[in-house]
Amino acid sequence: MNQKFRSMKNLAGMAAVLSAGILAVSCSGAGNATGFDNPIAVQADSIAVDQIIKPSQWAMCNGKAVVVSESTDSVFYVYSLPDFGFLYAWGHRGGGPGEFPNYVRFVDSADGDTGALTLENYRGKTFDAFEVGDREMALKKTTSTFPDQTTFLESRPLFPGWLATKKVSGGKEYLYTRSSKDGSVRDSVMLYTLVKAEYDDKGNMRSLSRMNSPRIVARNDRVAVVYQNVVRVDFYRVSAEGKLELLKAVGEPLDEAVLERLRTMRSQSRQNGIMGYFSTGKYLYTLYLDLELDWETKYANILEKIVYVYDWDGRQVRAFDLEKPATDILVSGDDRLLYARNLQEDFDKVYVYNLEQ
């Protein structure tokens, strides 16, 4: 499709926010997210990073950190863990066979270390899953994305056999489960997204603006719908037949009063919401930020940075108050170490927290 689609950025898109001056998150005042216990303060160690790169995303695979770099010939920079030692750079940007476009993003980076990382291949209309080895990355599997030429779809694989797709219909956004064999829809739930869409005279979507569109994090048969503009996570179980069963909703109620607040709070300097998220086999980690944004300089003064931890049934089990400002997190598969970075700083160090201290 050649139409231009625009998604209103929230805390999860602060990189674009700080450069473009666009921010749309809820402004419910200072203090911890409503209803949560006081977090445990944790102290940071730092590890120096010698490569001069500008990360757009990071992920974890096979015990290694994988950083997607902007504006460099090499696309992926791979680091050993827990020391964050540089191993190799892999993948080149270009238009030739086996090369990558300028925009590259893992669709499952928040799922944690599952043995592979998946890119959406817009040229080939496939999801390409890569393994991360000690010396190189390798294509493991491809799955069709089943695009729709009349509208905008945001999809990602779930466990084998199923895709999760966000799609606007009738002025509302829905989460669909679809077969990865033929793209057919099995189940759907409505999302609390504020949508503004324009269509041409043939019914094809011409533009799309979304606010409060959630991130979909998946692990085994569980799916977490993580809203960033309000502090809210919905936990689902996905059956072998692709049916969605709501297990628990935690955080703010998504009522009309909350949505109306979102409509009127786009330009406030005080902002809060969920920015980072990462999962392990046991837990989902969400990074809650309370910040003061200077619209002139595009700099965000992070006042509060709390990591809330839930099990996959939606129960909050822990909460940590990070020592250093952070905008993105990774967590080791044994739930012992948390890695954090602040995209407002140069990528010359990574902060490490021992969650067992």
Please provide the spans of the model-predicted regions.
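C-terminal motif of bacterial Sec signal peptides marking the signal peptidase cleavage site
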Residues: 23-26
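Beta-strand-rich domains and repeat architectures in extracellular enzymes and scaffolds
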Residues: 45-76, 282-292
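Structural signature of eukaryotic scaffold interfaces centered on beta-propeller domains
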Residues: 55-61, 105-113, 154-159, 205-220, ...
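Asp-box/WD-like beta-propeller blade repeats and closely related beta-sheet repeat scaffolds
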Residues: 123-126, 130-171, 191-196
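Beta-propeller blade signature
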Residues: 176-180, 299-315, 352-355
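Short, conserved, GDST-rich strand-edge loop motifs in beta-rich repeat architectures
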Residues: 286-302, 348-353
